[in-house]
């Protein structure tokens, strides 16, 4: 089986992290976002992954060549010369997708969830039509475009954009499976699959919805990235509790790379991931944070709801909170307060940031 992953965007919502790497290569719980998706696809029997690339494609290609060998699968690059929206990339990759008559997966690159790929194949084959969308339940449907479908069969009737009165609380989760016939609907031009292709398919009775049972998050911006981390760690607690770090000073769900060094009298957790080669000095307090590869947290620093980018340094007695994000190789001097700061790569912070703002 094949899968196409839409990885061509600039990832502007996840800056400053995406100024250093393309969004699919940002580390989420100590593994690039893209790798979470690819490994789940391989587990479900996918042996050929096609990446629809444009921004920083060289970096993606280099990383995925290594993964291709490790996973024993074929990974192809489909290069967009201009932005093609969410449907155009399918037309561009048509030759690769139609090498056989099997259905194929299509994924948005910033989705993290309990990937239901095997169930999708069964559901899609059962109804026998052109397309299946995975839908997920949300608390506030008025923020989203919702999917209205028959409860028993899953046949989609219509889509409603940001409804003001309740019609459905199910939204498109960005995971699809299609039969190759769907490609006859898509031309090689900038096209929205959600606004142009799906409504026509629904009208013809060719599109079905399958409800996701586990957690789901679009982690395309820092606030949601941290929420997604909490959900993922809870899922790890249920499925692979042995992956989590336990011991004195560790609270709740904490993921620590074996190469990280943790000092004395720290309080870490709940909901923390600590990456490879990270050093946490004595007396540090961390909760609801991601600390990426090669960073150092100096003694008695206090971090909550923050993301520390690769190879950054947080000084002694620093306090960081309220979705503060440090890009790659940022230095925060001692005894400063950062409240919702968004710090671009390679900066040195020498004064406090009492109100949320971007540091350029």
UniProtKB/Swiss-Prot annotation:
Requisite cofactors: Mg(2+)
Segments traversing the membrane: none
Region (Hexapeptide repeat domain): 245-360
A Pfam family reported for this protein in Swiss-Prot or TrEMBL: NTP_transferase
Active site per database record: 162
EC number, UniProt record: 2.7.7.13
Superkingdom as given in the UniProt entry: Eukaryota
GO MF entry, a single one: metal ion binding
UniProt keywords, alphabetically: GTP-binding, Magnesium, Metal-binding, Nucleotide-binding, Nucleotidyltransferase, Transferase
Gene3D superfamilies associated with the record: Hexapeptide repeat proteins (2.160.10.10), Spore Coat Polysaccharide Biosynthesis Protein SpsA, Chain A (3.90.550.10)
Catalyzed reaction equations: alpha-D-mannose 1-phosphate + GTP + H(+) = GDP-alpha-D-mannose + diphosphate
Cofactor: how bound: Coordinates binding with substrate and required for enzymatic activity.
Regulation: Enzyme activity is reduced by incorporation into the GMPPA-GMPPB mannose-1-phosphate guanylyltransferase complex. Allosterically inhibited, when part of the GMPPA-GMPPB complex, by GDP-alpha-D-mannose binding to GMPPA.
Pathway where this protein functions: Nucleotide-sugar biosynthesis; GDP-alpha-D-mannose biosynthesis; GDP-alpha-D-mannose from alpha-D-mannose 1-phosphate (GTP route): step 1/1
Positions of the UniProt region annotated as Substrate-binding domain: 2-222
Binding site for GDP-alpha-D-mannose: 110, 218
GO biological process: GDP-mannose biosynthetic process
Residues that bind Mg(2+): 110, 218
Summary of subunit composition and partner proteins: Component of the GMPPA-GMPPB mannose-1-phosphate guanylyltransferase complex composed of 4 gmppa subunits and 8 gmppb subunits; the complex is organized into three layers, a central layer made up of 2 gmppa dimers sandwiched between two layers each made up of 2 gmppb dimers. Catalytic activity of gmppb is reduced when part of the complex and binding of GDP-alpha-D-Mannose by gmppa induces allosteric feedback inhibition of gmppb.
Family membership: Belongs to the transferase hexapeptide repeat family.
The record's note on its domains: The N-terminal substrate-binding domain adopts a Rossman-like fold and has a binding pocket for GTP or GDP-alpha-D-mannose. Substrate binding is coordinated by an Mg(2+) ion.
Annotated function: Catalytic subunit of the GMPPA-GMPPB mannose-1-phosphate guanylyltransferase complex. Catalyzes the formation of GDP-mannose, an essential precursor of glycan moieties of glycoproteins and glycolipids. Can catalyze the reverse reaction in vitro. Together with GMPPA regulates GDP-alpha-D-mannose levels.
Record's protein name: Mannose-1-phosphate guanylyltransferase catalytic subunit beta
Organism: Xenopus tropicalis
Taxonomic lineage from the root: Eukaryota, Metazoa, Chordata, Craniata, Vertebrata
